[in-house]
Curated annotation (Swiss-Prot):
The gene is C19orf18. Residues 196-208 have a biased composition (Polar residues). Coiled coil: none annotated. This is Uncharacterized protein C19orf18. It is a single-pass type I membrane protein. Residues 191-215 are annotated as: Disordered. It comes from Homo sapiens (Human).
Length: 215
């Protein structure tokens, strides 16, 4: 019974650890620094814009449109910090639907484990109560002859004769202990009776001798 309970406890702790690992979106200690796209329900987080006042210039900036587009593409393609880019690639993406399914299944499985443990404990207690009843009935129906007396009568067939084979060793030990205790009680009773008879004889002899001396 203790082994079964320890196994259930280890399994329950393992499931809870897996559940927490899956529920955390960034289990490796990495945090997002940029925009994560392609996820359901995820919104693009725009970085704060630093608004700086440019000085007024009294001449117009003249740039060609082709050069301006190429420059904007190069700045968009090359990340400002390569370590941030690698971290964004290594992030474990969060899946809320999968996490909910795993959470519900783990909770249901843990409830089923608890119910199974309770049922097994109830069955174990009922089996122990039945064994105690069988032992009590066996103790009541057990007949042990006194030392030196002959066995009389036939053995009665009752509930004590129909026992489970699993409990034979325990019943044998119990029967041996009962036999030893009853024999010791019988021996003590006989010794007390002998001592009482000896003391009675001594008192009778003493009284008889006193009467003879008086005569």
């Amino acid at each position: 019974m203790d082994k079964v309970q320890s196994g259930f406890l280890i399994l329950f702790l393992f499931l809870m650890e897996c559940q927490l690992h899956l529920c955390l979106p960034y289990a490796d200690g990495l945090h997002p620094t940029g925009n994560i796209t392609g996820l359901p329900g995820s919104k693009r987080s725009q970085p704060p814009r630093n608004i700086t006042k440019e000085p007024k210039v009294f001449f117009h900036k003249t740039q060609l449109p082709g050069i301006q587009g190429a420059a904007s593409r190069s700045t968009a393609a090359s990340p400002t910090n390569p370590m941030k880019f690698l971290r964004n690639k290594a992030i474990i993406r969060h899946r809320p639907a999968l996490v909910k399914v795993i959470l519900i299944s783990s909770v249901a499985f843990s409830i089923a484990l608890i119910c199974g443990m309770a049922i097994s404990y109830m069955i174990y207690r009922l089996a122990q109560a039945e064994e105690r009843q069988q032992l009590e009935s066996l103790y009541k129906n057990l007949r042990i002859p006194l030392l030196g007396d002959e066995e009389e009568g036939s053995e009665d067939e009752g509930e004590s004769t129909h026992l489970l084979p699993e409990n034979e060793n325990e019943l044998e030990k119990f029967i041996h202990s009962v036999i030893i205790s009853k024999r010791s009680k019988n021996i003590k009773k006989k010794l007390k009776e002998e001592q009482n008879s000896v003391t009675e004889n001594k008192t009778k002899n003493a009284s008889h001798n006193g009467k003879m001396e008086d005569l």
